[in-house]
Curated annotation (Swiss-Prot):
Catalyzes the reversible phosphorylation of UMP to UDP. It comes from Desulforamulus reducens (strain ATCC BAA-1160 / DSM 100696 / MI-1) (Desulfotomaculum reducens). The keyword tRNA processing does not apply. The keyword Plastid does not apply. The lineage of its organism: Bacteria, Bacillati, Bacillota, Clostridia, Eubacteriales. Its EC number is 2.7.4.22. It holds the Pfam family AA_kinase. This is Uridylate kinase.
Length: 242
């Protein structure tokens, strides 16, 4: 068995990743495909936690731009992440992957409340932990949740699963000549305003020296390739020269 490069990782999934070609809602076949990739990764004894967004159901910032109270809209977005997390848990458990959903605020009927030490213990026992409901606070994205939880559970890297194969200097769908970066520093991302994650999340990763790998989720087996240390996507870290 190939030894993984990373022992404990956070996988960040967008809500749109669960929607498939429809772009909204949840596509059970897509969720099952993601779950199968995750199961394949666990065979390498990797400790895995997941943060999933809610944009396939609701975006808080979109609601606030149309007159809705921002805090209320963000709480609705947090609930959307819980729906996605339960869908992913269901898919994982159907293929016999022991999974726990932990929410940032109490929802005892459907999930555990987030407790750092319990989350770490679950991972040490080989269970997948899905962190739902964001940070539990409005005005913070699920990218920031991923950075925060990665720092708390001492993850070695955040794997940013996207719909594109890395970070570009322009939208590759609109600009065919856009350049893809193999490596970037946190400062590069912040100074250039690159769409990796929001600036709060990038700063949190920089302060805690948590690297990022941005890669294409749509390529089968890429989660495994990322964890085994294959060169895919775009790596974001500190001083890449030293």
């Amino acid at each position: 068995m190939v030894t993984p490069k990373f022992r404990r990782v956070i996988l960040k999934l967008s809500g749109e990743a669960l929607a498939g070609q429809k772009g909204y809602g949840i596509d059970p076949e897509v969720v099952y495909s993601i779950a199968s990739q995750i199961k394949d990764v666990l065979e390498h004894r990797v400790q895995l936690a997941i943060v999933v967004g809610g944009g396939n159901i609701w975006r808080g910032i979109s609601g606030s731009t149309k007159g809705m109270d921002r805090a209320t809209a963000d709480y609705m977005g947090m609930l959307a992440t819980v729906i996605n997390s339960l869908a992913l848990q269901d898919a994982l458990e159907k293929i016999e992957v022991d999974t726990r959903v932990q929410t940032s605020f109490e929802m005892r009927a459907v999930a555990e409340t987030y407790i750092r030490r319990r989350a770490i213990r679950h991972m040490e026992k080989g269970r997948v932990v899905i962190f739902a409901a964001g940070t539990g606070n409005p005005y913070f994205s699920t990218d920031t949740t991923a950075a925060l939880r990665a720092a708390e559970v001492e993850a070695e890297i955040i794997l940013m699963a996207k719909q594109v194969d890395g970070v570009y200097d322009a939208d590759p769908l609109k600009h065919p000549g856009a350049k893809r970066f193999d490596e970037l520093t946190y400062i590069d991302v912040l100074n250039r305003g690159l769409q990796v994650m929001d600036s709060t999340a990038v700063s949190l990763c920089m302060d805690n020296k948590i690297p990022l790998l941005v890669f294409d989720l749509n390529t089968e087996g890429n989660i495994k390739r990322a964890i085994l240390g294959e060169r895919i996507g775009t790596f974001v870290g500190g001083d890449l020269n030293g």
